[in-house]
Amino acid sequence: MIRSLYYKPGQPIRTNIPPAEFPRLIRDRKGTLWVDFIGEPEELAEPILRGFGFHPLAIDDALQETHTPKVDDWGDYIYLVLSILNYKQENGMFEAEIDELDVFLGHNYVVTFHDQLLTAVEDTWIACQRDIRHVQDGADHLLYRIVDSLVMSYMPLVEQIDAQIDQIEDQVFDKPRRDILEQIFALKRLLLTMRRILLPQREVLNKLARDDFRVIDPRDRVFFRDIYDHLVRLHDLNESLRDLVSGALDTYLSVTNNRMNEIMKVLTIITTFFMPITFITGFFGMNFFEPVAHLVGWTSQQVFAGMMSVMIGLPILMYFWMRGRTWL
């Protein structure tokens, strides 16, 4: 799908402009044109992109996903690759995938190219149609609004991750289950994916805020510097969350190890209690009552009662002895 939006001072916003008019509109420096490609096939998108005068290498990069945020300066326009983290939560676990947003920024136009509908782009598109202030400040300011919407979309995710970590920490102490461990590893994968996006994307915004691009008004660099500050903060939050997840994993392993040690302790105590009983029955056998009765002059019943008293009394004595040694 190809959709377009054009604003010129003193005129209402136009939408769904035929691609044949794009070359004429970009020659008019007073207006601002935004063309958005959503999953458009290469054979249809490439001729339109060539109509803007883009270099074939830049067009190839836009049509082929690279997943590496970058910015290329081509003089009259710049080409950006931005990564977007799409995520969903099922059964308490996050699943994420990386989408790519390719952007061409000229003096009076913005061209965006992506394979599927992106929330950040869609929100900006709707906002531009509702309020001309989103497009009346020029193409570079429109790019700022798109990127700002993209970056701010990470904040709800960070809050959800933080809340889930708190929940996991409480559950770990109550009852460490197998599914909690799976949630911890899912969070580690998600935060690692975020980190792989934030680091190179931060460098892209740093270049937009500091380098001298002809298509970006020096007065608008401060806006990109603001986005850069947001990315720095997001990166710091990501590092803090990674530390919290690692701490939750260490706590889980510590609690499970302690519980395993308690189980082994109980089993060892039970085994120790039965060791003298096993020794007695193994040494004398189960048919020693008659010989012993004749030897000591007791009846078989008396010998049986005596041996039972010994076998019951020994574990009791061992129990109090272990308590005295603070082993229990």
Would you name each region that the model predicts?
Residues 1-226, 230-235, 240, 295-298, ...:
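Peripheral, non-transmembrane regulatory/ligand-interaction domains of membrane transport proteins
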Residues 229-328:
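Hydrophobic alpha-helical transmembrane segments and their immediately adjacent juxtamembrane loops
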